[in-house]
Amino acid sequence: PEDGADSVERSGDHENSPYFAHPDVYNMESTDTLTVLHNFKTMQQTSEWSCGVTAALMVLNWYGKLGDWNEESLAALRHSLDGTELESYPGTTLNQAIDIFNGVGGFDIVSTKDYPDGIWMDDIQGWLAEGKPVMICWNDFGGHWQTIIGYDTMGTENTNDDVFLVADSYDTTDQNQD
């Protein structure tokens, strides 16, 4: 790999980092406060633009539909942005993410387009409880896709201390590239 998080595979890891705890999220199991997708396999993107398709690859793998799909073959399922204000944007828009899952087939897609009043923590908790990963994206700094795979209420009624567990295909910031 020449670019993306995969190009620095684990070079910044510190097993006993004094700054980050490294729970074994892959082997975690749900509890009375934690809902987690047990044994969700993460992947690292191999280019700077491929977070969206890599998030989709992780979801395909979760559902046993990975097959021969890879970053490039999923990217080819996206509609062109030529002639739009995003013409030179290399990443994946929400509509293009929908293209990917429609192209692979066999998915019932739910997106923010289906929720004009917004998606809330209760919605995400519900989908996780049903065993469904939740792809999320934001537009800051050019945009980035991640996949929510867990949610912990921390045993309190207050949502201010709640925690999302997120599979990040560009996982280079916590000294444990998992």
Describe the residue ranges of each PLM region.
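Conserved active-site-adjacent core of cysteine acyl-enzyme catalytic domains
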Residues: 10-30, 34-39, 73-178
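Glutamine-centric residue-chemistry signal
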Residues: 40-46, 71
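Active-site catalytic microenvironments for nucleophilic, acid-base chemistry
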Residues: 58-65, 151-154
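Short, solvent-exposed loop/turn elements at domain surfaces
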Residues: 60-61, 68, 174-176
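Short, well-structured active-site flanking segments
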Residues: 64-76
